[in-house]
A protein has these predicted regions:
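Thiamine diphosphate
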Residues: 1-167, 172-173, 181-186
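Glycine-rich phosphate/diphosphate-binding loop of Rossmann-like nucleotide-binding domains
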Residues: 198-201
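A short, charged/proline- and glycine-enriched loop
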Residues: 27-28, 191-196
């Protein structure tokens, strides 16, 4: 894993963008796809550095997933990004049939998840995405705590062959994880105590 890490407040989408560039530098099979949100999903630098490995599908989230599934069948590792309200929101059927049931190595990236969407408003608030994706067979769901964990999650996803959903947020948040021990499916203890246990996603 690269030595680059986040120490100042940053959005998890920033960690995704940095992590995607890092894994693409190491693995030529990594490709990026976006549904007309390249800047918002922090894929602009990836597009500039790897123009032959970036596909802009436009406002077509169902096609985003279909193209990603085809690339996975061809041996690529596609990271397909849009706002969570649109993917999985608008593309759940394609995710269900083409990715989850087929157990394809597709990484679905949902940005602006949750209620803090800034000026984008209530129509862009993805509140059901975790439930939608957790109900699918073979699908792994990852919700990083901060930008550094999001960066590490991208490395873990690139090395994992299962379909996965990476849920990202819009606002800048403090960095609370500082070690390189992110593992898919394993919790991290951030602070030891004896009086109470807080389990957060």
């Amino acid at each position: 894993m690269s030595n680059h890490s986040f120490s100042q407040p940053a959005a998890t989408r920033d960690g995704f963008g940095q992590g995607l560039i890092e894994v693409a530098q190491k693995n030529k099979q990594v490709v990026g796809l976006c549904a007309d949100l390249t800047g918002s999903m922090r894929m602009r630098k990836f597009e500039q550095q790897f123009p032959d490995r970036f596909i802009q599908v436009g406002v077509a989230e169902q096609n985003l997933i279909g193209v990603a599934a085809g690339l996975a069948l061809g041996g690529k590792i596609p990271f397909a990004a849009s706002f969570a309200v649109f993917s999985p929101g608008r593309s759940w059927d394609q995710i269900r049939v083409s990715v989850a049931y087929s157990n394809l190595n597709v990484k679905i990236i949902g940005g602006h998840a949750g209620i803090i969407t800034g000026p984008d408003g209530a129509t862009h608030q993805a509140l059901e995405d975790i439930a939608l994706m957790r109900s699918l067979p073979n699908m792994k769901v990852i919700v990083p705590a901060d930008a550094e964990q999001a960066r590490q999650a991208v490395h873990a996803l690139a090395a994992d062959t299962s379909p996965a959903y990476l849920r990202l947020s819009r606002p800048k948040l403090p960095v609370i994880t500082h070690s390189n021990n992110f593992t898919i499916g394993k919790a991290q203890v951030l602070k030891q105590g004896v009086d109470a246990t807080i389990i957060a996603c």
